[in-house]
């Protein structure tokens, strides 16, 4: 689908720009205050909707949140959309058939972009799990799971109606990636919501176990993509 390719280009530029911004802020933490002024009552400014409070280091556009946006934009918006674009393009040619369901393809596309927008909004609001590369809270984790399953169903359906007898190695890699990423995502994001009416949750793991599961997921998912 070309839509995934266009999304890859757009989010690639956004991700790189966010990375540059985070790097500049890391080099000079007071850079936002240099442009927008300082405010000792940052939290109070945030509550009153003051732009200055939003911009400086503890606000919505401070370093901590910009960095989370950068990593998530690169992984889930840029790299993932690129993977989907490549998978859709190559599967139809290697299997000599169209995707099994155009409807599922579009649900997959818009569902994934909805997830990205949700991540941006929640991160800017300070809603996150603090688990690096997996900071999104449990409702977004569920959305990712649903969309990932839709992608898998469409892929397996396309394989089932293929017009060639054999399967190229690339197709096996796609299947393996789909299964492995699903397992990594589910086990890494096992969380206990504080309440089903809110966003806050706590990891099902603690201490070293949590760190091992987190970074097994963080590094492996990137390699699979």
Functional labels for PLM-detected ranges:
Residues 158-166:
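Inter-helical turn/loop segments and adjacent helix faces that build the functional surface
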Residues 2-30, 41-97, 102-126, 139-159, ...:
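Hydrophobic cores of alpha-helical transmembrane segments in multi-pass integral membrane proteins
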């Amino acid at each position: 689908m070309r839509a995934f390719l266009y999304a890859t280009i757009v989010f690639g530029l956004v991700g790189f720009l966010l990375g540059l911004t985070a790097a500049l802020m890391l080099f000079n933490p007071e850079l936002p205050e240099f442009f927008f002024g300082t405010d000792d009552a940052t939290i109070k400014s945030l509550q009153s909707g003051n732009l200055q409070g939003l911009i400086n280091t503890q606000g919505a556009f401070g370093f901590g949140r910009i960095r989370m946006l950068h990593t998530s934009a690169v992984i889930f918006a840029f790299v993932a959309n690129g993977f989907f674009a490549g998978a859709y393009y190559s599967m139809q040619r290697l299997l000599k058939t169209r995707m099994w369901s155009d409807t599922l393809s579009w649900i997959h596309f818009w569902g994934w972009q909805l997830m990205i927008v949700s991540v941006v909004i929640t991160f800017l609001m300070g809603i996150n799990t603090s688990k690096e590369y997996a900071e999104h809270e449990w409702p977004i984790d569920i959305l990712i799971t649903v969309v990932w399953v839709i992608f898998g169903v469409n892929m397996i359906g396309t394989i089932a109606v293929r017009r060639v007898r054999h399967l190229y190695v690339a197709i096996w890699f796609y299947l393996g990636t789909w299964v492995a990423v699903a397992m990594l995502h589910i086990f890494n994001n096992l969380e206990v919501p504080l309440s089903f009416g809110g966003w806050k949750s706590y990891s099902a793991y603690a201490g070293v176990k949590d760190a091992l599961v987190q970074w097994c997921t963080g590094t492996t998912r990137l390699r699979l993509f």
